[in-house]
């Protein structure tokens, strides 16, 4: 299954969740797109709820189905912690996501583009793989030639706060994952236990 490339505002309204993190998509119409979106209150089945949570989380992090499923299977092989918590941590420690969390990009799609185009380094080495798993202590930075990118400077200026598990140096435009995140620090709008239930039936 390919990655969705349509309007993110439609996804956000369909899920009732701001995928951009700004909340603008839901400010005027906090219901699903379509003429009857505001009055669509059909009861969702248990399977429908599981599927909805899976899609919500997958679209939030911008993964296609194969990438998402493979990461889920990998999380299940980690011996410590719960399957759901480990899955969330693996999603959160992707390089593209941490570029976004550090404020070097205004959205995850923009962060993924920065990584793909070779603007990002990890411990001084260029990394152009968005799915690269960042380890605590590793330093994420912009390449020298990318220091003055307008979209990056704008993103940094508009960043109000950053998660407690990262640090950022505004002067050097470098950041680091200081520790693995705890579940309570991650997306509260998602019930990953439903995602686990969904895949336990499918796989």
Curated annotation (Swiss-Prot):
GO cellular component, one term: small ribosomal subunit
Full protein name: Small ribosomal subunit protein uS4
Keywords: Ribonucleoprotein, Ribosomal protein, RNA-binding, rRNA-binding
Family: Belongs to the universal ribosomal protein uS4 family.
Keyword set includes Transmembrane: no
Single Gene Ontology MF annotation: rRNA binding
Domain of life: Bacteria
Keyword set includes Transmembrane helix: no
S-S bridge residues: none
UniProt function note: One of the primary rRNA binding proteins, it binds directly to 16S rRNA where it nucleates assembly of the body of the 30S subunit. With S5 and S12 plays an important role in translational accuracy.
Gene: rpsD
A Pfam family hit: S4
Residue ranges constituting the S4 RNA-binding domain according to the UniProt record: 93-156
Subunit structure: Part of the 30S ribosomal subunit. Contacts protein S5. The interaction surface between S4 and S5 is involved in control of translational fidelity.
Any single GO BP term: translation
């Amino acid at each position: 299954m390919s990655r969705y490339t349509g309007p993110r505002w439609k996804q956000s309204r369909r899920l009732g969740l701001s995928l951009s993190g700004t909340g603008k998509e839901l400010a005027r119409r906090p219901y699903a797109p379509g003429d009857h979106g505001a009055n669509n209150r059909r009861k969702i089945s248990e399977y429908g709820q599981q599927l909805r949570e899976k899609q919500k989380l997958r679209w939030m992090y911008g993964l296609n189905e194969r990438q998402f499923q493979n990461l889920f299977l990998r999380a299940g092989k980690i011996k410590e912690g719960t399957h759901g918590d480990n899955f969330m941590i693996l999603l959160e420690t992707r390089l593209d996501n941490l570029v976004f969390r550090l404020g070097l990009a205004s959205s995850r799609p923009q962060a993924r583009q920065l990584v793909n185009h070779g603007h990002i380094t990890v411990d001084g080495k260029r990394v152009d793989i968005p799915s690269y798993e960042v380890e605590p202590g590793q330093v994420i930075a912009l390449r020298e030639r990318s220091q003055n990118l307008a979209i990056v400077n704008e993103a940094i200026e508009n960043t109000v706060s950053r998660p407690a598990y990262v640090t950022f140096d505004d002067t050097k435009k470098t950041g680091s994952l200081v520790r693995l995140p705890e579940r309570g620090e991650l997306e509260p709008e998602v019930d990953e236990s439903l995602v686990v239930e969904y895949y336990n039936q499918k796989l």
